[in-house]
Amino acid sequence: MKKILVRVLLVLLVAALGFGGFVYYMVHNSTSQIYSYNKKTNKSSDDKTASKKSVAYLLLGTDTGELGRSYKGRTDTMIVVVVNPKSKTTTMVSVPRDTKVDFDDVTIKINAAYSYGSSDTAMSAVEKLLNIKLDGYLLVNMKGLEQLVDAVGGVTVTSPLSFNYEGKSFVKGQSYDLSGSDALKFSRMRYDDPQGDYGRQMRQQQILTAVIGKLKSNPTTVLSQKFLDAVGKNVRTDVSLGSVKNLATEYRDAGNTIKSDQLHGTGQNIDGQDYEVMSDSEITRVHNLLQNAIDAK
């Protein structure tokens, strides 16, 4: 998902699936270069993971080449992920990139919040929209998806529709073993999908779930230099190493069940811009879904 995890899959894999203190030790060098201190979220995430409580992170996907460049771009992928160790469930909810929100008294698409400020700004926009509390973010570079999928040896997915994209063909109902390059094609196509960006979000979640499954079946993959290099170049997070350690040792069963959903809006053109406008009832539905995922026992 655009950058599909890895620290995301090393927080949300180590988070949701966990590989123990050994992995925590082995990935220290990689995670230290992708970590950004945030006083507010660090305390929240550290306190909750130490107490084995549910945590909610925001996955952000940008598409600007390796992270660290001056041009930040927009976060066309935004996914709220709740990891609950008690219910042994991970819940993912995608937020459409064109979602209409107010930012400093100006109407913008939610994917622009990151470019106007930072990952913290994007996180604040999602918190305000859904009336939830997030415990940290994981920012992944879209191009990194290709490297990450290759690092785990490829993934297998079943196509929900038939389409062609950049020379690769997919047939509805057929399963495909995808390389990183093909996984990127599978997750990027939008205009030929009858569901538009919603369809793309679901395919992104398919790739994410497949990567998680691959790492869970072969956790030693996370120790490979290829995998760690992909993480270092393409992932940034404010989730501390302390939280990662807690997630790795106490949250592994949360990957047993992965649930996916989306925030659905209505397309509207406002002042020449196309937005997805969310109804109060839809925002309430998703808020309740996420809150129930957090509170589930």
Predicted regions and their residues:
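Non-catalytic, solvent-exposed segments at the cell envelope interface
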Residues: 2-10, 15-297
